[in-house]
């Protein structure tokens, strides 16, 4: 495992604690502890939390594939950072889009979701292509 992968993986594992905290907050919202959220907001919060967790797991797995594909600087760094940034951007888009009292429509911060989708897509294509080229 490369030092670059160890660095990004270590940061991602530490970031999982924020997803855990978000889960306790989400549980409070869904249980009615925090009143005043619309169904739209609750749905966006659920989606943001779920995407953060799933995309973080994908990022950790992709880091190992990045090493196997032989991707090194600067493309390797771009792929690693792209996979690590995608969960943050996508979940920020879901959470940010739901901000505002009584919100029932996505706000302007939904743009972060789409930025995250494109970053993730680019990282997937680069890594997938590199893996196909690295076949022995």
What are these regions (language model features)?
Residues 1-136:
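Polytopic transmembrane helical bundles with strong interfacial aromatic enrichment
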């Amino acid at each position: 495992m490369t030092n670059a992968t160890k660095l990004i993986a270590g940061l991602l594992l530490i970031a999982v604690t924020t997803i855990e905290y978000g889960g306790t907050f989400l549980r409070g919202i869904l249980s009615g502890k925090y009143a005043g959220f619309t169904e739209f907001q609750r749905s966006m919060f659920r989606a943001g939390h779920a995407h953060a967790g799933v995309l973080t797991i994908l990022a950790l797995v992709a880091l190992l594939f990045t090493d196997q594909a032989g991707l090194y600087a600067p493309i390797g760094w771009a792929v690693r950072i792209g996979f690590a940034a995608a969960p943050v951007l996508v979940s920020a888009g879901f959470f940010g889009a739901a901000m505002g009292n009584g919100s029932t429509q996505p706000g302007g911060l939904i743009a972060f979701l789409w930025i995250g989708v494109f970053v993730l897509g680019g990282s997937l294509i680069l890594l997938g292509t590199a893996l196909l080229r690295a076949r022995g």
